[in-house]
Amino acid sequence: DCLPGWSSHEGHCYKVFNEYKTWKDAEKFCKKQGKSGHLVSVESSEEGDFVAKLISENLEKSHSIDFVWTGLTYKGRWKQCSSEWSDGSKIKYQKWGKQQPRKCLGLEKQTEFRKWVNLYCEEPQRFTCEI
């Protein structure tokens, strides 16, 4: 069972937050939402579709190009992708968009929140938590 305002999928609970935070602050915020709380990790095509629909339905409209943080970051000075999501789960599914030299990953509105894009970690974005 999920808390009020959260959506359930495959034993996890998800919520889209319309406030803007850096990747690090969004991850800290998600950790405070509940036991095992983290930025969303997309571990299958089905989960990706669920998350994309949830974001599309719950993200407040804006006139800017919208991105939503995921729990994936690059680690190390060569910007190699980390081998796990911020919640510690392994990467079993990938859906990359155009790659650029940025270290934090988000979902892009132009792809209906289905493709992953590299973003600057310090640039505030909206985000989705998973618990």
Curated annotation (Swiss-Prot):
It holds the Pfam family Lectin_C. This is Snaclec coagulation factor IX/factor X-binding protein subunit A. Ca(2+) binds at S41, E43, E47, E130. It is found in: Secreted. Heterodimer of subunits A and B; disulfide-linked. Keywords: Blood coagulation cascade inhibiting toxin, Calcium, Disulfide bond, Hemostasis impairing toxin, Metal-binding, Secreted, Toxin. GO terms for molecular function: metal ion binding; toxin activity. PROSITE patterns: C_TYPE_LECTIN_1, C_TYPE_LECTIN_2. InterPro entries: C-type_lectin-like, C-type_lectin-like/link_sf, C-type_lectin/snaclec_domain, C-type_lectin_CS, CTDL_fold. Expressed by the venom gland. Belongs to the snaclec family. The keyword Cell division does not apply. The keyword Ion transport does not apply. Residues 1-131 form the C-type lectin domain. Anticoagulant protein which binds to coagulation factor IX (F9) and coagulation factor X (F10) in the presence of calcium. It may bind the gamma-carboxyglutamic acid-domain regions of factors with a 1 to 1 stoichiometry. The dissociation constant (K(d)) are 6.6 nM for factor IX (F9) and 125 nM for factor X (F10). Does not bind carbohydrates. One of its GO terms (cellular component) is extracellular region. Disulfide bonds join C2-C13, C30-C129, C104-C121.
